[in-house]
Amino acid sequence: YFFSGGTMMEGSEIWIPLFNWTIDLGVLYIPFVMFVMIAFSNAVNLTDGLDGLASGITALVAFFMVIASVSFGYLDMPIVFGAVAGACLGFLMFNKNPAKIFMGDTGSMALGGVLSAGAIMMKLEFLLAIAGLIYVIEALSVIIQVGYYKKTKKRIFRMAPIHHHFELGGWSETKVVAVFTIVTAMLCLIGLMAL
């Protein structure tokens, strides 16, 4: 932001894509931004449970953010998102099944932080949530599982995050990664329609 000449992140409005609504949060924008950063970083971290899952999905979402940032006229952000997409694709060569190297919490939380910080700077938080809906679903599956178990002592999913639920349901690790990646590609196409 400091190098953007103040052209980004002015005001406290948020944009809701697909409906093209703009809502001014006022002072509530600060906790909203904090929530987005913390939630998205942790959601990407929760997604990093299978070989190639987080890196493959993040490569697609980052490439989508390149297109979104160019279409909104933010010509410096494609460099950041392009670097993230390229790094994830390079990392994916060594992280695909069977993985020779693992991302770990530091890598996955950094990726979530970069994606969310860039989206916040461009006021595209909800557009990021559309493209990265897999991250949101993964995080919600953990929240639902823990909350429901504490209340009833029963589980909704076989295991949380939800990618492990599918694994325990008989899906192979590569099938889960492939399906989640295809779903992310479709979500990115939906996000493109919102531009």
Where are these regions (language model features)?
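Alpha-helical transmembrane segments
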Residues: Y1-F3, F19, G26-L195
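Membrane-interface helix termini and inter-helical loops of multi-pass transporters
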Residues: T7-W21
